[in-house]
A protein has these predicted regions:
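Protein-protein interaction/assembly regions in multi-subunit complexes
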Residues: 1-230
């Protein structure tokens, strides 16, 4: 078996897309599952309510808090299950405080963390709507955990893979009728006026629907998968 290679195509604060070559389906699926359930992240585990006059049960608000994604520093934290403390400590957790009076809506950005580097990833997640005279005050403890324990510790929302496509155009059969270019739903193909031929311009965007193959009158185009590339 050839050596597996991983190439990052694009990456930002919200997503990463990469290409894996020299692997089979079982290995790529294992990598997908590891991304979902093995990578440690912070999530709120316990909530102590000091006051809650809102029209929402403590349990419901605690559940919402648990699903708020929190930025994580794996160099300074250890898994709660591997920590020597009895309950929680700065090595495995961080404390956040939520406090507010109505009328107003409290958002994830209102959670104040004792560590400015460990805070909600997004500030705009609505948590509770307070009416006039209602008040909420609580302390939440976020601990380092893994997705295999609970979904709130999953670092990804969607983690998927697809087979890598390979598109071959037979120049002898192709008459440049542009039928395949017009019918492709993802604009993978384009007509090169200088060379007077069809060319592939966005291969990775191909969903392998094979619409181009079906609509080509001369069967000049072929779409297939690369067995060891995803």
């Amino acid at each position: 078996m050839s050596c597996m290679e991983i190439e990052i195509n694009n990456q930002d604060n919200n997503q990463m897309v990469f290409t894996v070559e020299g692997a089979d389906v079982s290995l790529v699926n294992a990598l997908r599952r590891i991304c979902m359930v093995e990578v440690p992240t912070l999530a709120i585990e316990t909530v102590e309510f000091l006051k809650n006059d809102a029209r929402i049960f403590d349990e419901a608000l605690a559940h919402r808090l648990g699903m708020v994604p929190i930025s994580t520093d794996l160099e300074s934290l250890v898994l709660a299950s591997e920590c020597d403390c009895d309950d929680h400590c700065p090595r495995c957790s961080v404390s956040l405080v939520l406090k507010g009076k109505g009328p107003k809506t409290l958002y994830s950005g209102d959670l104040k963390s004792e560590d400015p580097n460990l805070k909600p990833v997004l500030d705009t997640i609505p948590l509770v709507k307070l009416k006039e005279g209602e008040e909420v005050e609580l302390e939440a403890i976020a601990q380092l955990g893994q997705g295999k324990e609970h979904a709130k510790w999953q670092p990804t929302t969607t983690c998927a893979y697809k087979n890598y496509p390979q598109i071959t155009i037979d120049g002898d059969k192709c008459e440049s009728c542009l039928q395949c270019v017009q019918e492709c739903p993802r604009n993978v193909l384009e007509f090169d006026e200088e060379k007077n031929q069809i060319k592939v311009v966005d291969l990775e965007n191909c969903s392998m629907c094979r619409t181009c193959m079906k609509d080509c009158p001369n069967q000049a185009i072929n779409v297939e998968i690369v067995e060891d590339k995803f």
